[in-house]
Amino acid sequence: MKSVITISASLAISLMLCCTAQANDHKILGVIAMPRNETNDLALKLPVCRIVKRIQLSADHGDLQLSGASIYFKATRSASQTLNIPSEIKEEQTTDWININSDNDNKRCVSKITFSGHTVNSSDMATLKIIGDD
């Protein structure tokens, strides 16, 4: 009888964890090492085109100063959008969600995201983590 209760409890916990994981549609799209000098050609190319409707940026291992970002969509006309991003992100800080202009179904297939910026207040290169939400 005790083993039946243990198995039932284990299944219930597994089911709760499974449903929680499915409810979270956030994916780490990639990480970019930010150089110490201003650079305007930092690109995150997605190997598989991802449907994304908004992104978050997070700084790890140092502070970041950003001067621009663009997102490129997989389309015959190479559609792109300039993103409105914060100029500074402190270490361990995550931005609010940044919405991506989208087509009628409120989603687009993202192929590349580019950034301009650099590491500040750190001897090591900071990293910029890009999180997507579909």
UniProtKB/Swiss-Prot annotation:
InterPro entries assigned to the protein according to its UniProt record, in alphabetical order: UPF0412_YaaI
Domain of life of the organism encoding this protein: Bacteria
Membrane-spanning intervals of the chain: none
Pfam family membership, one: DUF2541
Signal peptide extent: 1-23
Record keywords, A-Z: Signal
HAMAP family in the cross-refs: UPF0412 (MF_01372)
Similarity section: Belongs to the UPF0412 family.
Protein name (record): UPF0412 protein YaaI
Recorded name of the encoding gene: yaaI
